[in-house]
């Protein structure tokens, strides 16, 4: 079951023809995935303001009823329809323009689609089972546009095919300056001694809520120094450990990058602190 513009449908193919054509012709502009635990939306305010900021960047029309309360009601509607109200789940919110902009109407109305699936956040640190590698066929777009979830979506699809064909756990994406941005799964963090570093938003990495949550945990942890700055592929090979942050896993430790095999240490500590704050939120 899905929710589309406030109504519940059994499947996307059951949408009215006009709405389905709008989705097909215009495509999804904004995507946001949130976690829900027994009906409680985790970090909902942070997700909501990120979605609104993304709509403004893309000059999308924001209806007056797109309040935190209204969208929360719609999320609960899709959870109830899928019998997930008491479970752990991932909820996906997608927003797209209902029509093409014209000279007379440059800011068009925005439609939304909400889906949900059962998914529990890991109770222990997840460790990759395969190595990760650099993806060099195409580059991430730098700047504000690159921070949006959907901006480099086609590139990520191509990279996913490459990862599956070559049996990699994940792929590291680079921008036109050949600097590390993120991985297919999420924000990548490099550990060297007590210093933990990740690429800046200006590199083209997605400005996800969970990326910022982990940064906050690092900055509050004694004995850890956080830096947001350029990372070269060579820097990764000199790291003591690497980990990736996403809404799906929280923190996932990288097993191997090229010939370098990593042992999680800082990632274990950070995951413990993160999962505590997650449960209390």
What residue ranges belong to the model's regions?
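Helix-start/capping segments and mature chain N-termini
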Residues: 1-77, 105-281
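Short, acidic/charged, Gly/Pro-enriched secondary-structure junctions
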Residues: 69-102
């Amino acid at each position: 079951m899905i929710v589309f513009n406030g109504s519940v449908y059994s499947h996307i193919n059951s949408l009215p023809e006009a709405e389905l054509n709008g989705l097909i012709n215009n495509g999804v502009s904004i995507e946001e995935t949130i976690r829900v635990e027994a009906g409680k939306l985790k970090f909902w305010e942070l997700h909501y303001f990120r979605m609104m900021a993304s709509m403004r960047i893309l000059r999308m029309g924001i209806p007056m009823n797109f309040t935190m309360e209204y969208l929360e009601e719609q999320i609960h509607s899709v959870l109830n329809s899928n019998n997930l109200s008491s479970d752990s789940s991932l909820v996906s919110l997608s927003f797209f323009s209902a029509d093409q902009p014209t000279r007379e109407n440059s800011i068009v109305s925005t439609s939304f689609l909400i889906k949900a699936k059962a998914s529990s956040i890991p109770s222990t640190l997840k460790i990759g089972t395969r190595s990760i590698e650099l993806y060099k066929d195409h580059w991430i777009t730098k700047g504000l546009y690159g921070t949006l979830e959907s901006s480099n979506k086609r590139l990520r699809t191509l990279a996913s095919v490459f990862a599956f064909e070559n049996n990699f756990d994940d792929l590291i994406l680079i921008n036109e300056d050949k600097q590390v941005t993120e991985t297919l799964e999420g924000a990548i963090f490099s550990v060297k001694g007590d210093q933990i570093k990740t690429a800046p938003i200006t590199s083209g990495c997605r400005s996800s809520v969970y990326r910022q949550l982990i940064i906050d945990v690092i900055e509050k942890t004694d004995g850890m120094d956080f830096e947001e700055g350029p990372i070269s592929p060579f820097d990764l090979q000199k790291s003591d450990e690497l980990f990736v942050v996403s809404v799906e896993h929280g923190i996932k430790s990288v097993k191997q990058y090229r010939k370098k095999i990593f042992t999680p240490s800082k990632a274990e500590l950070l995951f413990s602190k993160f999962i505590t704050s997650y449960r209390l939120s």
